[in-house]
Design a protein with these regions (language model features):
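C-terminal regulatory/interaction module of P-loop NTP-utilizing enzymes
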Residues: 1-269
């Protein structure tokens, strides 16, 4: 089992990213990952877990998510229901406490990788509300008068699409890395992870067209890595001759998701 992250069979990581992951693990600090959509931020956590032989726990953050959700939930409604119908054990408050994803990570007997995904989707108070728990690796449950302490400090990876600026106090506690969009050479390596025995001409033509499209003036939503992978799947499924890609972009709707971008493409292809 590896003790340091050096990528995985399914994830191509740059040297800078590998070094940053290992520094965050060594310093026992959360790793904050930013980058445009489709650069592999979320997949990084799975790759780290796979490479280090750890279980992955995922906390998907939404606009309605509160920090409390990650700690525990007290099902007071169920307890009230049980008390009305005389169900046994209603006095045992622990029955109605369900740990959230952070609570699960703290309670795990072995070290886990905890992914807090898209933290910037929540309100501005969300990151600050987690400062104590991430610093001290513990939280208090007043309903049971118990403190939940991390048995093993989890490896915490936090992703952000930079939709909102995160508080300075939160940033100071993190190791930060911005995942740059892959250069063509690295992208080719990524494609070879996803596809075995892919036609060499198809790889060259599709990559040339993809990067040309990303640089095309007027494109508002540039296609991402995941959309490139889907596009190549479409090209293979459609039996497209690689030579055709020099003249047009087949199945452009797999790459471009805005009407305006499709219209921009039609003007030049």
């Amino acid at each position: 089992m590896d003790t340091k992250f050096s990528g995985s069979a399914n994830y191509v990581a740059s040297r800078d990213l590998m070094e940053t992951v290992n520094i965050a693990v060594a310093l026992q600090k959360p790793l904050l990952i930013k980058g445009e959509p489709g650069t592999g931020k979320t997949m990084l956590a799975q790759a780290v877990a796979d490479a280090l032989g750890k279980k992955l726990i995922i906390w998907n953050v939404k606009s309605t998510t509160k920090a409390q959700d990650g700690l525990y939930v007290y099902d007071v409604v169920q307890r009230l229901y049980d008390s009305q119908f005389g169900n046994a054990g209603v006095d045992d408050v622990k029955k109605y406490i369900k740990l959230g994803k952070l609570g699960e990570a703290f309670s795990a007997d072995e070290q886990v990788v905890l992914l807090i995904d898209e933290i910037d989707k929540a309100d501005l108070e969300f990151p600050n509300a987690l400062l104590w728990e991430l610093d001290r690796m513990e939280f208090y449950i007043p309903e049971t008068k118990e403190t939940v302490q991390a048995k093993q400090r989890p490896i915490v990876i936090i992703t952000s699409n930079a939709e909102k600026e995160l508080p300075d106090a939160f940033l100071r506690r993190c190791v930060f890395h911005y995942i740059e969009f892959p250069e063509q050479e690295q992208m080719e390596a990524i494609l070879r992870v996803h596809f075995e025995n892919l036609d060499e001409q198809l790889i060259r033509q599709s990559l040339t067209a993809f990067y040309w499209l990303r640089e095309l003036r007027g494109i508002e939503k540039k296609p991402s890595t995941s959309e490139l992978v889907d596009w190549i799947r479409a090209l293979v499924a459609g039996g497209v001759d690689p030579a055709r890609i020099e003249k047009e972009i087949p199945f452009a709707g797999v790459l471009l998701k805005k009407d305006k971008d499709l219209q921009t493409l039609r003007k030049v292809k």
